[in-house]
Amino acid sequence: MALEDFERPVIAAVRTMFLTSRAAARHMIRQGSGVIMAFGGYGDPIPGYYLGGLQVAFQAIDALRRNLACELGPHGIRVVTLQTGGVPETIPEGFDGREAIVDDIVRRTMLGRAATLDDVGNVAAFAASDRARTMTATALNITCGAQVD
């Protein structure tokens, strides 16, 4: 794998998370509250998958989330990550190998199903609400049991 191919997802993920968080934090600091929400992969690299820099990018986002939570917490800003383990609805119909990917996502879960976009939205709404006001510097595992924390 070429270096450029490996580092592309790492640079894109960290840069996007940093720039978006910085822009949001400027407003949130003024109001004394807010929630920055990231999306990422989960756990350790998956044997048998050759994802190049993608898993490294997920781990970098996880580290950045913890760092931002430490820096922004004193301003009343919470930072959380949603970890899904894959949402089959987001894989385009007709994508080469889609069926095998979806089957594998579901096979890895304890519940025999994968998270849906509705599931992700419901967890995101909760995480952004005052009901989750004690949660920061953490990842919310919505992998249907594919990842054991």
Predicted regions and their residues:
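Substrate-binding pocket helix/loop in short-chain dehydrogenase/reductase
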Residues: 1-7, 93, 101-105
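Catalytic Tyr-X3-Lys loop
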Residues: 2-19, 37, 54, 61, ...
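A short, exposed helix-loop element centered on a Lys and neighboring polar residues
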Residues: 21-22, 66
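Alpha-helical segment proximal to the catalytic Tyr-Lys
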Residues: 26, 70-71, 133
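Catalytic loop of short-chain dehydrogenase/reductase
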Residues: 35-61, 65-74, 86-87
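Short, small/polar-rich loop/turn modules that mediate ligand/substrate recognition or access, typified
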Residues: 73, 78, 135-137
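A conserved structural motif in NAD(P)-dependent oxidoreductases
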Residues: 109-120
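Short C-terminal tail/terminal secondary-structure segment
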Residues: 125, 136-149
